[in-house]
Amino acid sequence: MSEKESPSPQHKKDEVVDDTEQETKDSEDDATKKMKIKEGSKFTMNSILSPLESLARVQQQLLKMAAAQSGFGGNGSGGNGANGFPYPARFATNCFSGPFPGYNGSQNWYNGNDARFAAAAALLPCAIDPVRSAINHQFSMSQRRKRRVLFSQAQVYELERRFKQAKYLTAPEREQLANSIRLTPTQVKIWFQNHRYKCKRQEKEKAMSGLGHGDDGCSPPPGDDDDDDDKYSIEMDDKDDEEEDGAKPMLKSNGVFGLPYPSPANAAAAAAAAAFNFQFGAQGPNPAYFMRW
């Protein structure tokens, strides 16, 4: 029976070398795959730090060149400090006078052709210019405000004639009058409000001057060139809606709770009547009054 041949030391050494080379190749393949995965992703540390690193290298080169040209050490040549770094330049602005390829050449940095910057630039003048925005706001406010409509002479004549007949119109009467003179019911309604206000103001002025009241047509005094009746004003409040839809309103007194202000004679008469009613009353003498005695 023949004995198995034992492997020689050289053969064992070759096998160990082959295993080591295979492991090295496997590790290199794994590292290459990882680097490809990292380079393919957009948000890796290399993709973020690569522009900064290139910028730092460019700045360092510029600093070295400036220190070599205008440094403090040697005969005009750049010297090194205690830590081995070059001395700073005399004029720091020379270091940053040239363009930075990290910003211009790299695609990772945004440039002016980006669509988002174009949209922001389109909105920027209106946002930072207060004068222009104020003018635009003023124009929009003036455009939204309604203009006053001028009435024709025939329309004013018909409105005044109807106002002499009745100072308050119901909704059907207002609509009928508006259709006859080619106006809207709202214009007729506000014209009546303005005309009533004008009549009250003129009556108050006449009462203060002692001239008395005018006629029902509220004719203006001589020299009064007020043209409020010839205009449709939207600034008046829409009051007297219920009064126009119903009958003529009752005159309002100036007293508290709708009562007139008491005079001394009226106060004495009211006190005497109250005392008499307490003593006797409507049904006879009041027992509570006589129980006091």
Swiss-Prot record:
Cellular localization per UniProt: Nucleus
Keywords in alphabetical order: Developmental protein, DNA-binding, Homeobox, Neurogenesis, Nucleus, Transcription, Transcription regulation
Region (Disordered): 1-38, 203-256
Main location: nucleus
Keyword Transcription listed: yes
Residue spans binding DNA: 144-203
InterPro entries: HD, HD_metazoa, Homeobox_CS, Homeobox_NK-like, Homeodomain-like_sf
Biased amino acid composition, Basic and acidic residues: 1-15, 22-38
GO terms (BP aspect): cell differentiation; nervous system development; regulation of transcription by RNA polymerase II
Coiled coil: none
Pfam families linked: Homeodomain
PROSITE patterns listed in its UniProt record: HOMEOBOX_1, HOMEOBOX_2
Superkingdom assignment: Eukaryota
Gene Ontology MF term list: DNA-binding transcription factor activity, RNA polymerase II-specific; RNA polymerase II cis-regulatory region sequence-specific DNA binding
Tissue specificity note: Expressed in the 8 vulval muscles, 8-10 ventral neurons in the head and in the most posterior pharyngeal muscle cell, m8.
GO cellular component term of the entry, any: nucleus
Keyword Thylakoid: no
Annotated family: Belongs to the NK-2 homeobox family.
Reported function: Probable transcriptional regulator that is required in neural development for the normal formation of sublateral cholinergic motor neuron processes. Plays a role in regulating the expression of acetylcholine transporter protein unc-17 in the sublateral processes. In particular, it is required in sublateral motor neurons for a left-right turning behavior that occurs during the lethargus phase of the normal sleep process called 'flipping'. During 'flipping' animals rotate 180 degrees about their longitudinal axis.
The name this protein goes by in its record: Homeobox protein ceh-24
Species annotation: Caenorhabditis briggsae
